[in-house]
Amino acid sequence: MSIQFNRETGIGKVLLNWWEGLEDDRASRAILRRATSVTAVALTPPYQRLYRRLRGAGWADETRSYHNDRLAAAIGLLSHVKQNDERALAKTMSQCEGAGDRPCVSELRFRRLLESPDLDALFIGLRRVLPLMNHGVNVLGLANDLVHWGDDVKKRWAYSYEWPEKPKN
């Protein structure tokens, strides 16, 4: 079974409805925002409640544990997201309103995200760049990218990011 979050899949609908409901569920949002690692997210009651809802919507019980860890990372990050931006995540990182030609996320910081040695480092790095993007990302895109994190997603991000031109001397 391929894990896919979109508006047509059960798990995509549950995730999007949950995220939209976070505005009114300030306690759950605060608990998730305080989590400093993927493990800390996975141990929170709000994550566990959502995980049970996702299982009911089609998230397989036998899903590999690394998928569950990646889901926890996505949920922790989504608690920081305030706006659903339909653009691809890397595109959002490279296009910043009011910054002229400068990207929201610098080239160096973007490369560091791509080179994250493990999921916790990626989680921390993404949590730090969310304010640079005004807390607006593609909700379902972020979940998909994290659950499927690997070379294919990294390459897609590299192709989507609008690398700034170097000034000519």
Spans of features found by a protein language model:
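Basic, alpha-helical nucleic-acid-binding regions used in initiation and control of genome expression
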Residues: S2, R7-N169
